[in-house]
Amino acid sequence: GSITKERSWWDLNRYHLDISVKPEEKFISGSNKISYTVLKSHDLMQIDLQTPLILTKAIQDNSELEIIHDGNAHFIKLKKKQNVGSKEELIVYYEGNPRVAVRAPWDGGISWEKDKNGNHFIASSCQGLGASVWWPNKDHMYDEPESMLMSVNVPKGLTNVSNGRLVKID
């Protein structure tokens, strides 16, 4: 997508993606806490999330915000004045059955497979489509986070393998 005014006024600092994966239902739900710095005062923020996933709620400072859905772009109406230079946070919630990869990794999405022992093997391939094929974010390469925390809840017997450094297992 293009660098819209709803993307350009804020600088992405950090994500905390917190999700639950239900392999039997091919379902993902969770939230993404987005930390950002205000570059220009604006009251509309674009978050990207591809159908068939649904952005269900947005919260800032304990206040639920209105979301205007326009295809894979979701525009969040901010209530709080966005002062230039201020550091802010927003939490978006989502759920659904993400696009299934047709021919991973070239035609991406989520691959819901099983190994020879019948154990679930789930993988994302989103290089071409963008990460918004399976989680809500600012899906444009001109602005990437300085850091990201991923919290992934999987059913007993499964292990999540992700990029980065393991912090803890609950």
Model-derived segments and their meaning:
Residues G1-D170:
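Acidic/His-enriched low-complexity segments
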